[in-house]
Amino acid sequence: MDHQACNDTTPARKAPQAAIGQVLIEALPYIRKFEGKTFVIKYGGSAMKDECLKNSFAQNVTLLRKVGINVVLVHGGGDAITKTAEKMGIKSTFVHGKRVTDSDMITIVQMTLAGKVNQDIVRLISEHGGKAVGVSGLDADTIQAVPCHNAETLGLVGEVAAINTAYIDLLCNAGLIPVIAPIGFDDEGHVYNINADDAASSIAIALKAEKLIYVSDVAGIQAHDAILRTISKTQAADFIEQHVITGGMIPKVISAFQTLDGGVGKIHLIDGKCIHSILLEIFTHEGVGTQFIAEQGNDDNQ
């Protein structure tokens, strides 16, 4: 920056400069607190489709890693799987939101998730200065699976049985960002399609993560026409009973508190359609999404 620019003190210039400075100062205690901690981020929804949002996400993840936070990504890719299946003349069928997965479909799932989707995320992070490594859940037994409880209907859809935390820790300790495709296999070598939310939750619990962050298409938990910045287990139960929280949000909320019970520090639900939503949620006092906490009163983003 030249000398003239440094001495530009017009109100129009000073206002944004002051705002930027305030944000950076506000972030400092959070950066100190979270250095060396592990964040598991589930990446999905519109943030995986829009180019601007994809770049914003990659920048956010790279910055987290640069300030000393261990970042573990678990990604979805349902739309990409459906498109690939259509190109191959295979129709996708869903039961209660879960993809029916036969032997042909599991091949497409592997090819799409562990292939193009995973590699695109790794490439994008690398373009923004991060060091990411693609991980299939099959690699080094990262995700060990068992058939889901209604396998007779869903086919090769699995549930997480165990996580190889040693392998993930090895990658994080090397300064890398593991980008994990949610597929796994059982003791007999059968490969399973695993729900990305469930995989992220299991990985966060196994790693004893400080935070699990869901990057989604909703701004957070809505109650009485406003987004709740914080919700406790007691509040959630009351809102479900009062039909304030309804429909598909109920299992998400229940799952979030089960993850908290598993030992994860906090759960965050944020809107992936908001530019830099991860940084704003983690490094500012107000945040931009909803954080789930075990007890009311611990309601800051720390």
From Swiss-Prot:
The record marks 42, 252 as: Transition state stabilizer. InterPro entries: AceGlu_kinase-like_sf, AcgluKinase_fam, ArgB, Asp/Glu/Uridylate_kinase, NAGK-C. It holds the Pfam family AA_kinase. NCBIfam families: argB (TIGR00761). It comes from the Bacteria. Belongs to the acetylglutamate kinase family. ArgB subfamily. Its main location: cytoplasm. Catalyzes the ATP-dependent phosphorylation of N-acetyl-L-glutamate. Transmembrane segments: none annotated. The gene is argB. Coiled coil: none annotated. Substrate binds at residues 77-78, 99, 193. GO terms for cellular component: cytoplasm. It catalyses: N-acetyl-L-glutamate + ATP = N-acetyl-L-glutamyl 5-phosphate + ADP. One of its GO terms (biological process) is L-arginine biosynthetic process. This is Acetylglutamate kinase. GO terms for molecular function: acetylglutamate kinase activity; ATP binding. Keywords: Amino-acid biosynthesis, Arginine biosynthesis, ATP-binding, Cytoplasm, Kinase, Nucleotide-binding, Transferase. CDD domains: AAK_NAGK-C. Pathway: Amino-acid biosynthesis; L-arginine biosynthesis; N(2)-acetyl-L-ornithine from L-glutamate: step 2/4. It is found in: Cytoplasm. Its EC number is 2.7.2.8.
